Amino acid sequence: MRVVLLCRYDGSGYHGFQIQPNNNTVQEEIEKALKKINKKDIRVYMSGRTDSGVHAYGQVLHFDTELNIPNEAWKKALNANLPADIRIFGVTTSNEDFHVRYNSTRKTYHYKLYIGQNVDPFLLNYVGQHKYNFNFEKAKKTLNYFIGEHDFSSFCSKNSSVEDKIREIMFSYRSEEHTSELQSPAMI
């Protein structure tokens, strides 16, 4: 049976998603949880990798298993065996023709940049910081060079099984202003 997961994680304490020797990774934690449930090693496949310290709001994964467990029970069992910074939010099954990497049609990335000297400590792990004046117009103009279809062959390994290396990059921009004003209830 092929089980498909929707996973969310805070990557602050991990060296990326993919297993690496001598480094703690998200994939390693998920595979350890699956081993506890399945009583044997289970390989997890991902739709894409994240780098060290990067978070995921909707990473799609799959694995194959002989266990026939209801979807909600998979979710409950996995979350019970995963660290609190990795959560499974959705579970479904699929036929064996589906592969998260090869059937993925889109990936969305969010980059958050805090402009200013005093970033809120609760945002530190979730934003990049630029301490001085930032030219938004120049940044948007530069990002326009990336928009459109591009050939990513030079980023693939020689043995890559991916046939179509053309990808389309789209861009959207949103600005939000945050206040550093402290709002806290009185403590007694």
Locate predicted features.
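Structured-RNA-binding interfaces characteristic of tRNA pseudouridine synthases
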Residues: 1-180, 184
